[in-house]
């Protein structure tokens, strides 16, 4: 197995100083799978202070648990001392850790066999728990007793599902049965951590595997709104964008269901509100003319409209023909290329201009601006001061808010 040069440099520095050191965990797994590891983590028998003595630039990122971050050029690498975890009284974190000189003790505390492989500087691999075999069999299997692993940390339940979705692996039988038994323990996991795993699932290449949430009996423990989820392989055809994919997943429910679930899970507002907005957008009929398309662009904005088209093309939001979507996309491009006015702020006449015409501030003023915009959406050629003044005066007369003809007239009466 090939080890990147900087990682090799760290490993060799440590071994030359008399310590053991290995790349470990997800980076080794991903390298075996031909995937580019996001991070390279290193495990060692050296104590944190000994690690710090070997490198010029370090950060104490988790010194209590034996982790030091080494900075090399523009990269950072976490180096953690071999350890044995104590009891997990909160079902999430070890109450204590004890450092150990034995690599095997460190590896057997980990979650799944595919995450237990360690690689030396020369590329040789230590695989004590059958990680390579499980990679070859495309399966997720707990290290040792799965009941113990899930009792220690309930987040591992969702990590198993997430790895299954990301790697398109099956979950080994004993691991799956234990996972289901321990689903109630998810009450010990913060909503933010749960959502982080769900986001990784829905952004994966196999979001349809979210149906395992139901199969494993997990939904009652994390959010009843997920009963309305649509786990579909069609979601994978969409760009890996959270609000877009959550909109697809909740497309058979409604926007408020999506918003409620995501807000309850402490999602960022952009994702929660964006998903709800997209769902409302794909519920309506596809516009058939320029006015309807301008109105759609005015309400949702061009980015959201293009995402709605993507959702519709992928089959979400109800039946619609490819020809309808092609025409909608074509009209959208024409409107945007022409620079048509699509918002009140782009009208040739502003609210301040209306007040100077003698129209009183208040809800009526906003209504008049809305009327002006609607007329311009129907006919962009009306977006001139002269035309809009006439439209505003007609609208004001209809509302009993009649302006004077001269700019600045303050004597307008109802």
Per-segment meaning from a language model:
Residues 1-414:
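Catalytic cores of the polymerase beta-like nucleotidyltransferase superfamily
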